[in-house]
């Protein structure tokens, strides 16, 4: 209870965000961590901890790891795994970890080499307010309170677009009707990260949404600053790694220019450029290394010169772009690399395409499956399945490297999700195309922009498969070089340009508008005009790519491929579902012996899947026969099943029979039914009447009007 001496009191900082309380608490839980903060938003609660190692590690990068841990008790569920405990993070947890990692990573000081671990644990999820946007807020607050050097704070918000108006932090229910799902993380001065899924939204609306998000996150930043002023620990002392003095770096840069660095950097081929650059670096460093009196180079300084050479390369590449408008492969800022496209490349795949842009190449494939192929989602959401899957594979050979294959990487999960969001907006409704659809993007070559090439290849493969998408989708990766109020926007960036730029963003969409956007900003606040110009330049490139795609395949194919499963649908009365299934599933098993799969939904919808159309048609006929209902006035070819003294029972179709009374068998008086009919005879009969108990009276249509119908008492 509150006030008990043994229970530490939490420090609470609170505000109202989109009509719901946002609370930051610290000082009560996980106190041995360098920084720990509990964040509550309505009934969604996450705990973030920040910890750094006491000593630096030998590395030339920031050793930061971010984990996003989902606890199933947060939604009152027991995990569905065999061990009934949480295992490896699922896709949503990986995406949430990346959403936290990307905006905090650029704010660590350059050269900081202490291991840093951020763990965000979801303790409660109210099924209304998604916990993913709380990850960056909680991680930022924990870092602010810790002794870890970090130039925060940051905050994150989600923006929806409903009825033409922006909605701050829409609930999961509101997102279902929103035209936009935009997550923005930023600092006071700048937007640092953007993730968006959109329903063909125009560029001006996106810029307005970004501005709206940045404005609305400011109170969260102020709340963290207030907490840090009162509670933050002193920052740890750390020593930056040794580097060359600035004057030696400058001398190395001038020497590199004299020896022809610019020409080496403008070698068109990635492989040739890498080899030429490595040889150039070796010669340059050997020349630049200080020599002893005996002429022996100071090998101890070689790592410093190698590190400085990377800075020299980055500086010269940026200079070429800013001052001369030249890029490493000789293109201008707005130029696309050469593109070639193939479709229908695999004989057995349900849809396939190869999209090649410069030295980036992706094989896209589509597989159509049944309802049984849907992915079961065992996460913190409501129990549901997923019918549209997009998977991205990035093997080491695509970059000419050797690397152990250790399963799916976080990067592969993130890129696959980006491609999925790009394509999702144009996918057909389930009632129009009831297949489970899996798109796979296998990267065969990579030199930048492979995720956007996956969007293009995946779209072409969908069209090749005959999936009736609403419009083609293309994607392009953009870059920005920004210096002293000078900005050059680069279209279709190389891997080399991705590393040297100040911002990279990937834009996918149709001719009508944007369907997905991902952005990472490494510099301060960018003017609105630059953001809009970048989006418009991306649109210009996207339209050119769509022109090329539509030249090869103008529209989805009208027919499915021969090996794709066929789906036939029909509706049966709910009360007859049991009849279709049969005792112990007997009837369904009999249908499956035809080589089909049968799915039956609670509303009576029956779907039949088979790669053999004739088998599917036969199964459909059997189900229709099982569930048919006789109608007054309809004529049937029936089979005599029983003879009685008062008439003959005729089977109209499986499960349904009627009585042909003795008075209706022939003109005149009939003494014995057996004189006119025998079991097994097939005759035409017409339904004359169905009583309230469902009993059917039949007549012979050829005798109608010649003998009066029987009257029931």
Swiss-Prot record:
Residues 565-631 form the KH domain. GO terms for molecular function: 3'-5'-RNA exonuclease activity; magnesium ion binding; polyribonucleotide nucleotidyltransferase activity; RNA binding. SMART domains: KH, S1. Mg(2+) binds at residues 498, 504. It catalyses: RNA(n+1) + phosphate = RNA(n) + a ribonucleoside 5'-diphosphate. Its EC number is 2.7.7.8. Pfam families: KH_1, PNPase, RNase_PH, RNase_PH_C, S1. The keyword tRNA processing does not apply. InterPro entries: ExoRNase_PH_dom1, ExoRNase_PH_dom2, ExoRNase_PH_dom2_sf, KH_dom, KH_dom_type_1, KH_dom_type_1_sf, NA-bd_OB-fold, PNPase. Keywords: Cytoplasm, Magnesium, Metal-binding, Nucleotidyltransferase, RNA-binding, Transferase. Its main location: cytoplasm. The keyword Cytoplasm applies. It is found in: Cytoplasm. It is an enzyme of class 2 (transferase). Disulfide bonds: none annotated. One of its GO terms (cellular component) is cytosol. GO terms for biological process: mRNA catabolic process; RNA processing. Its cofactor is Mg(2+). Residues 633-701 form the S1 motif domain. NCBIfam families: polynuc_phos, PRK11824.1. Belongs to the polyribonucleotide nucleotidyltransferase family. Involved in mRNA degradation. Catalyzes the phosphorolysis of single-stranded polyribonucleotides processively in the 3'- to 5'-direction. This is Polyribonucleotide nucleotidyltransferase. It comes from Thermus thermophilus (strain ATCC BAA-163 / DSM 7039 / HB27). The gene is pnp.
